[in-house]
């Protein structure tokens, strides 16, 4: 059995070779000659999986090592009897930590305490729910907007988007991209919403680029809208608006979910799903795959304040390390994808053990995801 894997899926060759012969290939584009005799295909979000790619092949299973699936025509796959699995939640922690890094950076620059802000979270799935829990652990007021969950009667208090626009200091978007239907999220942030948004707010998009109307956002910023903006995703990709990049406060190349842990979770989840599909179920212990981090232990003396917390967070990951490279190469052909393909190793807070002499600080750090003694 021949299994094609994206060359940028960590541990894919090591794991999938347990099930067949593995060939690592570029994700954009996938060589057609490699597909000709392949039985299974494992991709990331850069690969559009549809009839145009797979018609006439013998592919019997597709896995995407990503939480999102809008790059996969799963309806067509089902019609063809092709097995399919994604990796829901695999990079949720990474995205949450990206948002925190950005917020802590803006808090330092603009002289505010995150605890004093209200954060509106739009989309309360794997990412949004984890972000909500960690913000609440820090004492931050949150407002949640998730119409599908509200209509299902899920536990929790959900509000219409209009309330978040009016009351939240921060709007952070973590929705899927739905281009039709009752939960259409295409251009959820449009000219009308931007006009209604009070000045001196923060807008974060780390889900899908087209959730925010990039043209409308650029126009608002060009007209003097006072809005701190963090964009990890763009409309379209891999191209992006250079004038918009020049005006956002933080801009990165769709890497919010790119921790080593997140990528490894994606690979292992898809591997386990494929092994079940073959009737050969296997389970992988994530920790057995991961290397020792560059920084693994630190001593915190005294109580934790936001300044110390920012330094701890940024010791593991500082979003500025991804903002500067994009600005340097944006507009050059192929550079957006190159930044993603050759992404510098990034770890999650759970890779750092913090020794504390203050029990309340240790409890908070544990809730935020750090290891504590």
UniProtKB/Swiss-Prot annotation:
Pfam families recorded: 2-Hacid_dh, 2-Hacid_dh_C, DUF3410
UniProt-listed GO biological process terms: 'de novo' pyridoxal 5'-phosphate biosynthetic process; pyridoxine biosynthetic process
Main localization, broad class: cytoplasm
UniProt binding sites for substrate: 45, 66, 258
Cellular component aspect of the GO annotation: cytosol
Pathway: Cofactor biosynthesis; pyridoxine 5'-phosphate biosynthesis; pyridoxine 5'-phosphate from D-erythrose 4-phosphate: step 2/5
Keywords: Cytoplasm, NAD, Oxidoreductase, Pyridoxine biosynthesis
Enzyme class: oxidoreductase
Catalytic activity entry: 4-phospho-D-erythronate + NAD(+) = (R)-3-hydroxy-2-oxo-4-phosphooxybutanoate + NADH + H(+)
Listed SUPFAM superfamilies: Formate/glycerate dehydrogenase catalytic domain-like (SSF52283), NAD(P)-binding Rossmann-fold domains (SSF51735)
GO MF entries: 4-phosphoerythronate dehydrogenase activity; NAD binding; protein dimerization activity
Residues of the active site: 208, 237, 254
Localization annotation: Cytoplasm
EC number(s) on file: 1.1.1.290
PANTHER family: FORMATE DEHYDROGENASE 1
Subunit structure: Homodimer.
Entry's family note: Belongs to the D-isomer specific 2-hydroxyacid dehydrogenase family. PdxB subfamily.
Name of the protein: Erythronate-4-phosphate dehydrogenase
Chain's gene name: pdxB
